[in-house]
Amino acid sequence: MRSPADLARIFTTNVGFYRPLVTTSFAIDRALWNLDARGYALTNVTLLLGNAGLLFLLARVVSLSREGALFAAAVWAFNFHGINMALLWTSGRTALLLCLFAQAAALVVLSGRRWAPVLAGVLALAAMLSKEEAVLLPPLLVVLQLLSRRQSDARAILGNSWPLCAALLIYLLARGQSGAFTLVNAPEYYRPTFNLAAVLKNIGEYLDRGATFATVASIAAWLAARQGMTLTADERRTIRIGITWFVAMYAITIFVPVRSSLYAVAPSIGSALVAGAVASRAWRTAPARFARVASTMIVVIALLLPVYRSRNHGLVEPADLATQSLATIRTAVHDRPDARAVVLIDDPQAPVRLEDAFGALLPDAIHLFVNPGVRATLADAATPGSTDAETLLFHRRGGRLVPVMPDSQSLSR
């Protein structure tokens, strides 16, 4: 991105999905870090910490204790599902930005300030420009206001919702002119399905991914509280808000045939709020017992770090293969400046294949990381006569990509 015109094109170019703020964030990363993956990872970690902080503030705004709010933020951040993908996958940036803008919008509307409706509309639009699930944010924010006001004026709340409606309209118009996916022309695995069996399976899967960890934490906090002590009005209201958030943020994705744990990142904010309300009750009625339970949970999470790490192998192994492969190709092309093409021969029996590492983006990866003048082809076997003096051949050996000499002898490095 070198000019304002490039920025404008981000909002008008069809790349399938319509997530221009995510693309803009990557452009900023490119300007700061060039192609150093560690910089992109640092941005994702920063967004995760920012989201945890916003969840703490949101829990405080709905009147939870500091301890309950901190408990909610921890439950969300240490969920087994989704958070790891949001950090490790490039595409995970979408979920992190959605959560960031959605929570900021919720904080603003619940503040009750005079300027809140307009700012909430801007933040809701930013969330929509980050991920499609946010189209339900305008009605969700209206419902949250109705649930949170002790003496709510429904007419005033509905009257002040026009900036949210305007944000949705602007988003739909901008998306429509970009040519992005619609319900009609999206790939089949992204088109909504109303097959009852498929929807019920999705509901079960997403209840697990978005609520299991929060449920376990809630049970532990409930048992820590003094028995017979009821929830306060604020705690009950927070539970209603959390359930509403959870349902709204899943309302679209349960109808999408393809499942992804990334879809659980935003809804699990709601289940974390429920856990925070239960924890607030425990702290209020039995602070010493709650402190022991919370300390035990911290120790358990620390002991489970190897489990968290092992669950990420399937996410990082393709990235490791891509990094090693590009480094090998870059070295070989540097040694052969006359090379104009590379052919990569994959191992069909390998648990992680080059296709897993690059997908359809191998030419783009070679263009960015190696040389824009070099063509790239991925194959399962070399075709006799398919290479020439300007083509470099590579194949897999021992799980790694290695160059092949013209006499078929591998280079040893």
Model-derived segments and spans:
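Polytopic membrane enzymes that build or remodel cell-surface glycoconjugates and lipids
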Residues: M1-R413
